[in-house]
Amino acid sequence: MWVFGYGSLIWKVDFPYVEKLVGYIMCYSRRFWQGSTDHRGVPGKPGRVVTLVEDPEGCVWGVAYRLPEGKEEEVKAYLDFREKGGYRTSTVVFYPKDPSIQPFNVLLYIGTCDNPNYLGPAPLEDIAEQILNAVGPSGRNTEYLFELANSLRNLVPEDADEHLFSLEKLVRQLSEAHRNLNHL
């Protein structure tokens, strides 16, 4: 069994796996539209983490992990708990970056628009402010954003995830502006 990571599973892998491959899935786009009250925010002040939205022209880069034989159900149970904030699973085709490897099916966790933590679209400036100010049990929401952007830049330099990289730039600008205000 393979699992596809497109958010924190790219840079925060805390489950056993025997192989990992960089690649992409099609017909989705990555968006910071999922609320997080259990990792990067708290109830009443949620952070924002990524989910996938259907997009016929979309392409989402990430990492596929092959789970150890005999441990699939154990790891899946762990991931079901980790991704407990309103995610459902689906099976999609994964296209490895290495063209010599044939596409194959992966398990995908998606925060759907009908779950209680789904925040949906908002102006990029509002999303950036929310990420800048949110903190939860797993740390600052900015860490999540910056780790994801850095990881994707390192793994897939050719990826031009406009939503992610525009948001990263905006949050860095807002953070700098807040720092400058605090030093007046």
Curated annotation (Swiss-Prot):
The biological processes this protein is annotated with in GO are: glutathione catabolic process
The catalysed reaction is: glutathione = L-cysteinylglycine + 5-oxo-L-proline
In this UniProt entry, which cysteines form S-S bonds?
none
InterPro entries for this protein = ChaC, GGCT-like, GGCT-like_sf
Q: Which domain of life is it from?
A: Eukaryota
Keywords from UniProt, A to Z, are: Lyase
The EC number(s) this enzyme carries: 4.3.2.7
**Positions of the catalytic residues:** 83
Reply yes or no: does the keyword Hydrolase apply.
no
Write one Gene Ontology MF term: glutathione specific gamma-glutamylcyclotransferase activity
Which residues of this UniProt protein bind substrate? 3-8
One Pfam match = ChaC
Is Ligase one of the keywords?
A: no
Q: Which GO terms describe its cellular component?
A: cytoplasm
> Family, per the entry?
Belongs to the gamma-glutamylcyclotransferase family. ChaC subfamily.
UniProt function note: Catalyzes the cleavage of glutathione into 5-oxo-L-proline and a Cys-Gly dipeptide. Acts specifically on glutathione, but not on other gamma-glutamyl peptides.
Task: Identify this protein by name.
Answer: Putative glutathione-specific gamma-glutamylcyclotransferase 2
Organism annotation: Xenopus laevis (African clawed frog)
